C-alpha cells in the first residue's frame, strides 16, 4: 500500500503547472510558507545565486540554503505532482516528532530568513544578497508630549522622542477593522498616555500626558503583512482566534492609506503594492490547517490564482477569488487569513 508520499511520486505534475509539497504530519504551515517564498521571483533568484562550499558551509545535508535550492529546483522543474521537504527539515535540525507539531508560521519565517542570511554572509556575497533586504522597512517609534510648551498653548513641543524600529513584517489588528487598509490605519493610531497611565519623562523629571505611536519612514520592495488573528484571553487564560472579517485588496496604495496617519512622515512616497500571496489558516487557536493562495508568478498565468494545499495545487475559480478578496458580501471573506 502506497502512502501519500509514495503515490505522489507515481503521478504526473498537476494541471496547475505547479508542484505541491507533501505534509510530513503537521507541516502544512511550513508548506504554505515555502510555496509563497518559491513563487516570489526576487527571493528565488537570491536562493539560486547561493554557491555551496563545504569548507565554508559545512556538511551539505545541514546547509539550509543548499537544501532550499534543491527543493526550489524540484518545485520548478520536477515532473511529479508533489515533492518532499524532509531534506530541508533535516537541515533545520528537526526531529521526526517536530514534523508532527504545528509551529508559528511568522516566527518560522523570521528564523528561516536569519539562517539564510547567515549562510549568505559566510559566502562573502555582501549585503546585496541578503534575503532580509527584500523585506526590511523602517518605522520611527515616538513618544510625544500632549502638554503645551510654556507660553505657547497651540504647540505641544515640551517633549518629543523618536527611535528607529526596523521591521520585516508589519503586524496589523483585525478586530473590527473590516479591511486591510483600515487595519493599517489603525496600526498607526497613537495611544494616549494620560490619567493613571501618564508617561514619566526623565528629561522633564515628571509625569506628562503623551502620545505613543509609530510612523512609517521607509517601506521594502516586498511588503509582508501579518494579520493578528491570535490573541490571549485573560479571563479564560487561553489563546483565542479573532475571526472578524477582513477584506483584502488586490492593490493597496500606501500613500493614500497612510495619508490619514496623525504623524505621517511628510514628503515620503511609498507607492502601491500588488497582492502576491496569502497564507490562510482555517480552524481555531488550538489547531487548524494552513493553505497558501498565490497569484501566478509566470507571464502565462499572472492573472490567475492558485490554491496550494500541501500536495495538491489547483487553480482557483472566479468565485473563490472573489470570496478571498471580499467581493461577495454574503461570504465570511478572509476571516481565517493569517
Where are the regions that the model predicts?
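Exposed substrate/partner-binding surface patches
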Residues: 1-16, 37, 50-59, 74-79, ...
Amino acid at each position: 500500500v502506497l502512502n501519500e508520499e509514495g503515490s505522489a511520486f507515481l503521478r504526473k505534475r498537476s494541471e496547475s503547472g505547479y508542484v505541491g509539497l507533501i505534509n510530513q504530519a503537521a507541516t502544512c504551515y511550513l508548506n504554505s510558507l515555502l510555496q509563497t517564498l518559491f513563487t516570489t521571483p526576487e527571493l528565488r533568484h537570491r536562493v539560486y545565486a547561493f554557491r555551496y562550499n563545504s569548507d565554508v558551509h559545512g556538511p551539505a545535508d545541514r546547509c539550509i540554503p543548499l537544501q532550499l535550492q534543491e527543493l526550489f529546483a524540484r518545485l520548478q522543474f520536477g515532473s511529479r505532482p508533489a515533492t518532499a521537504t524532509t531534506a530541508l527539515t533535516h537541515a533545520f535540525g528537526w526531529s521526526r516528532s517536530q514534523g508532527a507539531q504545528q509551529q508559528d508560521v511568522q516566527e518560522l519565517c523570521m528564523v528561516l530568513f536569519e539562517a539564510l542570511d547567515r549562510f549568505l554572509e559566510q559566502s562573502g556575497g555582501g549585503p546585496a544578497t541578503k534575503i532580509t533586504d527584500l523585506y526590511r522597512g523602517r518605522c520611527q517609534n515616538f513618544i510625544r508630549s500632549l502638554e503645551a510648551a510654556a507660553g505657547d498653548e497651540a504647540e505641544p513641543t515640551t517633549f518629543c522622542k523618536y527611535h528607529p524600529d526596523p521591521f520585516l513584517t508589519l503586524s496589523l489588528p483585525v478586530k473590527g477593522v473590516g479591511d486591510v487598509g483600515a487595519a493599517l490605519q489603525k496600526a498607526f493610531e497613537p495611544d494616549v498616555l494620560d490619567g493613571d497611565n501618564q508617561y514619566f519623562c526623565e528629561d522633564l523629571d515628571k509625569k506628562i500626558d503623551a502620545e505613543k505611536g509609530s510612523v512609517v519612514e521607509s517601506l521594502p520592495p516586498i511588503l509582508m503583512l501579518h494579520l493578528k488573528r491570535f490573541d490571549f484571553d485573560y479571563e479564560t487564560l487561553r489563546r483565542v482566534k479573532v475571526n472578524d472579517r477582513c477584506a483584502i485588496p488586490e492593490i493597496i496604495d500606501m500613500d493614500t492609506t497612510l495619508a490619514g496617519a496623525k504623524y505621517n512622515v511628510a514628503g515620503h512616497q511609498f507607492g502601491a503594492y500588488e497582492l502576491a500571496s496569502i497564507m490562510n489558516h482555517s480552524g481555531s487557536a488550538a489547531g487548524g490547517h494552513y493553505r497558501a493562495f498565490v497569484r501566478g508568478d509566470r507571464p502565462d498565468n499572472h492573472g490567475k490564482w492558485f490554491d496550494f494545499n500541501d500536495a495538491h495545487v489547483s487553480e482557483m475559480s472566479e468565485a473563490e477569488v472573489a470570496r478571498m478578496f471580499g467581493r461577495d458580501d454574503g461570504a465570511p471573506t478572509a476571516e481565517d487569513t493569517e
